[in-house]
Amino acid sequence: MVHEWALAESIVKTVLDIAKERKIKSVLSVEIAIGQLQQIELDILKDALNELKRGTLLEKAKFIFVEEEAEFQCRNCNNIWKFSDVKKDLKADEAEAIHFIPELAHVFIKCPRCGSPDFIVLKGRGIRISAIRGVTNGSPSFDNS
């Protein structure tokens, strides 16, 4: 829960900084891409964002969340697989560790084909603001951040 609040604080601060830089007077919507590997508690993140936006340029903003599926590639056999293929094999404490520190995936996840722990994360980690829509000088503007 604390993790989601910290992420919400970072998102709000970043959007406010971008809005100030781009002279946005009111933010209408923020699109947030969330990597599946983060395993975010979306309800907690939404509650935190809605609480933190009060009294700011984000007060009327709608937050739109897009989940990016995590995908890996084995460096040993070049197999490509998805997080959903191996998540069921993780213990609860292992999944929680990956939630807080996604880099720990290399400790707990192995290639389902050859068993190697040597893989790269192709996509689906981290959180990024993918778009901000707001009002500048009375007219709506769209900003792909």
Regions found by a protein language model. Give the residues of each.
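N-terminal, polar/charged subdomain of small-to-medium soluble alpha/beta proteins
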Residues: 1-29, 36-145
